């Protein structure tokens, strides 16, 4: 997917000024005369930057404070409120872009659910979130480990059975002489019943049969006008005697349920409710029964139908009948089907619907319900802000303004972006600028998104100043880099444009930034580089569409491919070896993508692709590649290796080891031994396991493999030897790895030099790595450990420029400031990074600094926020306990 919320300004036909065919109709890298004559004009309009997105997320000014509040409330609130607090925590992490953390919060909401409705909503939501992970469940089953997490629940078992009617109906007393039996006449048919049994069904029947009415003395009562069939009346009679419904058809149950409601027969209604719920066998059946359940106020049936709808997301939300039911229900009907979980329900539905189509009437309906069922300010903020984003997309500007205004007035300052954007659309550019200026001046410290948004309402140097400030405060924002790159390209400074976009691509592989760089390379006639970027983008997202979704990425890839030199299989392997050795991960991805289009050994290539994607911090794409490797494995023993990696990467280490052993049992192979060694080294706390790991890696090296993988095995073997203090053996491994151009072995060899007390040699070794590696932020960080403080500070400043998401440099600089008794400056240094990265170690260190200066309140806040990130971190728990004991 490109962007979730594309901008209106990008919806013009950008391809009117760009004909991809004309750009690519070239001979030997030269534009045709017609294309070249219009190139400057084309290129200026060709590369367009979409306006900054307004995200439909909860984005509090101080997420640390909010996480701390949630953590504190979780410690003190009643059990039934915990799920909704975890849902709020989920929304905070979603706004921060923390996928793993938000999913964990959703898991906690499900685990802490105290009602069946919460269990159904959160369980179904998790099932939706984990789409595509069914293979993991299957693999666990093959290892004898079963998961029953998200199977449909037996809804009826969570509802207490109705055991008796009112005392008046159950205890029948009368001084009047009446017969023991009564006959109900329906048309020409007569159904004989026991008067006492029928009377016990409800108070109305008791009054009818034993009350002070003339009819009460009758032995025969005509029920023909009560819209009940004789068959249904027989079911009522039988139930009055035996108390259960046996072998009753669905249609008859529906009729009996209506009858039970009419005559207030609670036990009978409950029995019908349960029986009907048990008969739901499909989506069609659930759709058919839901209207009836809501009309007749049947909670078990309604909840069971709802479970089917949620369990089948997202497909069920493409059914207009399902959507119609879920959006037209009134408050009472929502209570019938969702109990006390309506806000959770519509949070789930609106989020899934926004992923399908954020502009749809369905999304609007769900968001309006979300707002209706918000019970506090936080929930209202989320609902109104989302509603404002959706209204803005639909160009319903007045309604969008009302929603954003409400969210803003409730304290959601981020909603000011929506108000400013609306002001700009209506021609009030200065007002929009002043709105953001007011926000910036009222907040300390301001956040990056504030300057990014304000930049949209000014030009020239002012705009660039705001964008520089935005990057300084939040280097993860992509818009400033893209704008600066395109601006420099428009000034014919291609080198500066590439340097700018490479800044962010060095640490964040964002599709929109790859697209911009692709366009820059096209503008420079560098088709090989352009091809590399489009292939990398298609690796991340196979269905990626460029130019605001107007052109399929595959189409552009095909067009560019016609104008680069074709590589043979041997050429591809040489290119892969070269780029892998130079730690050029994006280049390696491109080569593998090209190789996969041939009939090469796809399993091996998809596996290599997954390794690269993990290095590039793209875990979801990496897992997709690993599953493709499994599907394309050429043998059972190869497939078992990929299954082992799938299990290991999803936290199932023992099962991963089991798969590796199964693979070795079929055939000894490099990858099976490597997997077994890797998993054992990473998971075992037993020091004696090192000898086993060494043996496994030695076995791996005896098996056939290519130099890329052998280099990795030698590098890993060297690491084990270092841990065992066998430095000579470790050095041999690293040197042998370098001989096959495993460039990262420089880092291991540097460690050996350092442990031999040769710090200068360690520094030089890391310098060699820096010179060779294209992605070298980690190398600068490691080199900083082998030099004096001033050089270390210089290296770590370089790390922050190359990859501002690496937290060690901030911690180091803060520690240096703390040593110099510059406590406030130290805390400010940590706060710089915490503003855009929810990191446990940063929060931990800042909490310790706050404790050191006696600021218990701030220390406790940071402890609680850190425990929201990792609830089981032992050192954090100890610090929290210590700080908590000092709280007044």
Curated annotation (Swiss-Prot):
Keywords: Coiled coil, Ethylene signaling pathway, Repeat, TPR repeat, Ubl conjugation pathway. Pathway: Protein modification; protein ubiquitination. InterPro entries: ETO1-like (IPR044631), SKP1/BTB/POZ_sf (IPR011333), TPR-like_helical_dom_sf (IPR011990), TPR_rpt (IPR019734). One of its GO terms (biological process) is negative regulation of ethylene-activated signaling pathway. Signal peptide: none annotated. Transmembrane segments: none annotated. Predominantly expressed in flowers. TPR repeats lie at residues 381-414, 441-477, 511-544, 637-670, 711-744, 807-840, 842-873. Belongs to the ETO1 family. The BTB/POZ-like domain may mediate the interaction with some component of ubiquitin ligase complexes. Possible regulator of the ethylene pathway, which acts by regulating the stability of 1-aminocyclopropane-1-carboxylate synthase (ACS) enzymes. May act as a substrate-specific adapter that connects ACS enzymes, such as ACS5, to ubiquitin ligase complexes, leading to proteasomal degradation of ACS enzymes. This is ETO1-like protein 1. It comes from Arabidopsis thaliana.
